[in-house]
Amino acid sequence: MPLTLRLILLALIAIAPVACTLPGGSPTATSSISFMVFGDAAEKAAYERLVAEFRQRHPDIDVTLIHIPGQSDYRKRLGVDFAAGTPADIVLLNYRRYAAFAAKGALEPLGPYLDQSTLLSPGDFYTEAMTPFIWKGVLMCIPQNLSSLAVYYNRDLFRAAGLPDPSPDWTWDDFLQTARTLTQDTDGDGDIDQYGLGTEVSLFRVAPFIWQNGGDLVDHPQTPTRLALDTPAAREAIQWFVDLQVKHRVTPDAVAEAAESSESRFLNGRLGMFLNSRRGVPTYRTITGFDWDVAPLPQGRQRAGILHADAFCMAQVSRQKAAAWTFIEFANSGEGQHIIATTGRTVPSLRIVAGSPAFLDPQARPANSQVFLDSIPFIRTVPIMETWVDIEDLAGEELKRAFYGQATVDQAIAAAIARAQPFFGASQ
């Protein structure tokens, strides 16, 4: 069946009423549900469009979109709301963070809903997106996204420096040399005005480079008992990452980053490359001053990427579970994922949408979205555990100290391991 026809059929199915009896019952005559997300203005607009389309098809279900701009504020709001027993009916949760709520019984398992759905089937989704959201054998949330870390680059700056577009098989050395070439004092005053690279400094950012070098984040990925950042392979990768700043100076230092974030520099045309997942695309599409595209991560000893996936999760205390499921089901149908994909926000978790023009349209930037699909076979995940966010945050604090020259790599690794250790015993 042609792809376009299949998408149309999926859309028609989304409009039709579901006849099965859902675990949460049937929606009442008029139901009101809340849906909480985070992100910048462009991301908010994407979800506003999704909600608007849903309302047209389900006028009996009123959806209130709650938008929290900052990720840190969003995490705090989630914690407060769930602790108070007043969470939104539906929340977006990253696979690294949902376990903290699942372990407390705060999420409604969605596997039984999916099993009874006539609109969605587990086999329609990428396994790589679904598996991380299985907690103790049960699917807890429905993933919308199968992104990975990539290199966004300013093509105009590449051309001005005489650089070709990054090749699919470029190496760490190629990456570093490119960043060096792009780092420039453009006005001759002795200060760097244009950096070659910008990145968040976190365990999540350095992880794929550790894997590429043959190392790992923890001792046993399925049943971790400690961070394994002190192995030779992991340490070497961390040193390489830290040297991008302390040795090669191709990224802003702490003072420069505080004055203007790397992402802002990229948006303003004064940064050659920026590491991010797909979620930055709606914002980057507002760029009018230069051409840009996306490239895969450079390769180390082996190829490896890191999963960036979030999912629609339902609060266990929701009083409108049937209505909430109806929205989640629509959002992850062919039609719903098509809506979000065209905004640039996601790498769709539905195979049919990921392979469609909604995602791969070469006329919509980035032109090389195929990069994200090509990386799927090499995607890896962090451990799925209740306390991983705490571990990641503490390790990130120490990595920042090393990255900005406030500690050696060995000091940062030792401190990260020691500070994180209590959280391994506290996780289910």
Task: For each feature predicted by the language model, list its residue ranges.
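Short helix-initiation/N-cap motifs at beta->coil->alpha
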Residues: 67-77, 96, 170-177, 252-267, ...
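Glycine-centered hinge/linker elements that transmit conformational signals in sensory
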Residues: 178-180, 223-255, 297
